[in-house]
UniProtKB/Swiss-Prot annotation:
GO terms for biological process: fatty acid biosynthetic process; malonyl-CoA biosynthetic process. The gene is accD. The lineage of its organism: Bacteria, Pseudomonadati, Pseudomonadota, Alphaproteobacteria, Candidatus Pelagibacterales. Gene3D superfamilies: 2-enoyl-CoA Hydratase, Chain A, domain 1 (3.90.226.10). It comes from Pelagibacter ubique (strain HTCC1062). GO terms for cellular component: acetate CoA-transferase complex. This is Acetyl-coenzyme A carboxylase carboxyl transferase subunit beta.
Length: 309
């Protein structure tokens, strides 16, 4: 019977250890977080733009944090975007979709997973969008699709460049075909932006995957990426199981994706403001020259037509 008592005592110790572990809420509210070399104060991480000073890991941040860093606090206007009906399919799995949305809104303070802003960068007026990974994994549903289209429309109406900061796991399964249709809608909207000769810059952040990668994330005039960002369509294990080969080191990270030509530049978070501003200046001058050339060609054609008649 002695071994039974020992087993019971051991079980009680395990229960005590489990109870002593911090909850997700306690971890989120803590002054500390962890990175490569152990615990680090969130305050120190924030002062370094949420980049680890030891390993240079670019931690995930919210749209508002990102906009504060790149555009400056109180230097942007958050635009109110249309919000369609919640849960049109009455989706229910381990947790009702409506409850997931309520929890996401409470956690992020956002109505949907995308924030659209009107702002300026180096004296250039722009429209910008950023996704929040904490909002149902940054996935794209009808509300996010509406936000993206609203941002494009605002950019076209105000003749502004369009900058997108991607972050998310793809299309939202709880909205099925409604979610998948956002790939088409965002692509068509980008085509309209390009017809108006307005620059479209994509900044790929960790993680960018699935249908996001397969649609608007790869349609920019230029693609920038933060260091170490996961950029993929399918997961590495899925690919490895399909090709039955060992994948290269760093596969699907921004450094590897840059080598294959899908990313133009890898830019540190601290340098994004200057880099985006300078690239937009170049693109705007280029597009202005193209428009001027097209106008001259059109005038020449009219003159020739008039002379011929």
């Amino acid at each position: 019977m002695n071994w039974i008592k020992k087993t019971l005592r051991f079980g009680e110790k395990i229960k005590t250890i489990i109870k002593a572990r911090a909850t997700k809420t306690e971890i989120a509210n803590s002054d500390w977080t962890s990175c490569c070399k152990g615990p680090i104060l969130k305050k120190d991480l924030e002062e370094n733009l949420w980049v680890c000073p030891s390993c240079n890991k670019h931690h995930r941040i919210s749209p508002r944090q990102r906009f504060d860093i790149i555009f400056g606090k109180n230097n942007y206007e958050v635009l109110k975007t249309p919000i369609p009906q919640d849960d049109p399919l009455n989706w229910n799995d381990a947790k009702p979709y409506k409850d997931r949305l309520k929890a996401a809104r409470k956690k992020t303070g956002m109505d949907c997973g995308m924030m659209v802003v009107n702002t300026n960068i180096l004296n250039l007026k722009i429209t910008a969008i950023a996704s929040d990974f904490d909002f149902v994994g940054g996935s794209i549903g009808a509300a996010e699709g509406e936000a993206f289209l609203y941002g494009i429309q605002h950019a076209i109406e105000n003749e502004q460049p369009f900058v997108v900061f991607t972050s998310g796991g793809g299309m939202r399964m709880m909205e099925s075909l409604i979610s998948l249709s956002q790939m088409t809608r965002t692509t068509l909207a980008i085509n309209e932006l390009k017809k108006n000769n307005l620059p479209y810059i994509v900044v790929l952040t960790d993680p960018t995957a699935g249908g996001i990668t397969a649609s608007y994330a790869m349609l920019g005039d230029l693609h920038l990426a933060e260091p170490g960002a996961l950029i993929a369509f399918a997961g590495a294990r899925v690919i490895q199981g399909t090709v039955r080969e060992e994948l290269p080191e760093g596969f699907q990270r921004s450094e590897y994706v840059e080598k294959t030509g899908f990313v133009d530049l890898i830019v540190e978070r601290k340098d994004l403001r200057e880099k985006i501003g300078s690239l937009l200046s170049i693109l705007l001058k280029k597009n202005s020259a193209i428009n001027s050339s097209e106008n001259e060609t059109s005038e020449d054609s009219r003159a020739l037509t008039k002379a011929a008649s």
